[in-house]
C-alpha cells in the first residue's frame, strides 16, 4: 500500500521521511514545523538542541492563549520550549539526513522544503476522579512528514 505524502517530491533531488503515530502535541508540532521550514539540516538540528536545552524558545503564533512571553524571540512575544516534540523532530531530521546520505546527497547541507504535522487520532486514557468515577484523559497521536532538497532546486510540487 505504501505511505502517502501530502506533496509530490522529485526523488532525484529530494529525500524524505515520516514519523508515524507519535504521542506528541499537534499544536507544538505545528509551531516547530513552522519555525524549521527553510532551514538547513545542520541549522535545524542546532536549533532543536537549543530548544531542548531551553536556550532558544519556539514562537507560538497560533494556539498562544495563556502562553508566556519570551525575550529571545525576534518579532514575536509568545513562546515555549516543547521538549517532547523537539526530541521527536530531532529524531526525524537525523533519519531524513541519513536517508539523504544513502541516496548520495550531503544530508547536512540540504534544506527543509516541506514539513507538516497531521493529527491521526487519540490514544484513549482515563483519569480517576472522586467517588469512583473517571474522566477521559486522552493523548493526541500525530504523524509528521519531512522532505528535504538540495539548495537551488525545486523538486517539490506544493
UniProtKB/Swiss-Prot annotation:
GO biological process: cytoplasmic translation
MF annotations from Gene Ontology: rRNA binding; structural constituent of ribosome
Gene3D superfamilies per UniProt: Ribosomal protein L22/L17
Residues in the signal sequence: none
HAMAP family per record: Ribosomal_uL22_A (MF_01331_A)
Similarity section: Belongs to the universal ribosomal protein uL22 family.
Quaternary assembly: Part of the 50S ribosomal subunit.
Function: This protein binds specifically to 23S rRNA. It makes multiple contacts with different domains of the 23S rRNA in the assembled 50S subunit and ribosome.
The protein's name in its UniProt record: Large ribosomal subunit protein uL22
Highest classification ranks of the organism: Archaea, Methanobacteriati, Methanobacteriota, Stenosarchaea group, Halobacteria
Amino acid at each position: 500500500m505504501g505511505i502517502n505524502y501530502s506533496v509530490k517530491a522529485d526523488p532525484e533531488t529530494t529525500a524524505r521521511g515520516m514519523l508515524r503515530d507519535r504521542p506528541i502535541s499537534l499544536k507544538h508540532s505545528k509551531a516547530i514545523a513552522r519555525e524549521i521550514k527553510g532551514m538547513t539540516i545542520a541549522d535545524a538540528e542546532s536549533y532543536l538542541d537549543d530548544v531542548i536545552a531551553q536556550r532558544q524558545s519556539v514562537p507560538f503564533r497560533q494556539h498562544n492563549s495563556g502562553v508566556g512571553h519570551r525575550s529571545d524571540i525576534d518579532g514575536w512575544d509568545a513562546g515555549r520550549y516543547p521538549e517532547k516534540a523537539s526530541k521527536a523532530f530531532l529524531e526525524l531530521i537525523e533519519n531524513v539526513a541519513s536517508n539523504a546520505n544513502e541516496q548520495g546527497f550531503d544530508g547536512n547541507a540540504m534544506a527543509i522544503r516541506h514539513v507538516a504535522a497531521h493529527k491521526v487520532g487519540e490514544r484513549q486514557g482515563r483519569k480517576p476522579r472522586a467517588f469512583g468515577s473517571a474522566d477521559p484523559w486522552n493523548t493526541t497521536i500525530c504523524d509528521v512528514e519531512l522532505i528535504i532538497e538540495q539548495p537551488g532546486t525545486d523538486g517539490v510540487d506544493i
